[in-house]
Amino acid sequence: MKISSVFPWQQAVWQLLVQSRARQTMPHAFIFSGLSGVGKLHFTHAVSAWLLCQQPTALGACGQCKSCQLWQAESHPDYRFLQAMTDEKTGKTSRIIKVDQVRELVGFLNKSAQLNGYRVAVIQPADILNINAANSLLKTLEEPGANTAIILLTDQPLALLPTI
């Protein structure tokens, strides 16, 4: 994936994240919500690359380190992107993210990072987690491992379970 910069209307949130990381008070979970097409996924990619980068700056990921090279090759071992599955036979995409998918993601998040940095998991759209899947995620959201970032993307934040 290309390492991208953030859009101008995302600068205020970006600066909050930069300050949090500098103070070592980075939250472990984020909900990025907004209308479809405003750049949530673009912003999420920038944040993910920056968190995984071994030499991050206030402007973003360096683009040069091993972690950035793996990011650009779309093969970073400490990054997972979770979305509804597509049936191989029918080609139809499920309307929900299933509990088995979340359990696999939680297993990934409970392991140590392979590059000794962050582990980043993105769930898009988080509002299609079924109840069992959302409940499977709760303990990890409440008590994540060190250097873990979970990013939930949604166009419909009110559709998320209240506990999330």
Question: What is the predicted role of each segment?
Answer:
Residues 129-130, 144, 159-160:
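Catalytic P-loop NTPase motifs of RecA-like helicase/translocase cores
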Residues 124-125, 152-157:
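A short beta-strand-to-loop transition that corresponds to the Sensor-1 phosphate-sensing loop
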Residues 110, 135-152:
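Conserved catalytic/switch belt of AAA+ P-loop NTPases
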Residues 73-75, 144, 164:
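Short, structurally constrained coil/turn elements
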Residues 1-2, 164:
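Short glycine-enriched loop/turn motifs at secondary-structure junctions
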Residues 57-60, 148, 152, 160:
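Short, surface-exposed helix-loop/turn micro-motifs enriched in polar/charged residues
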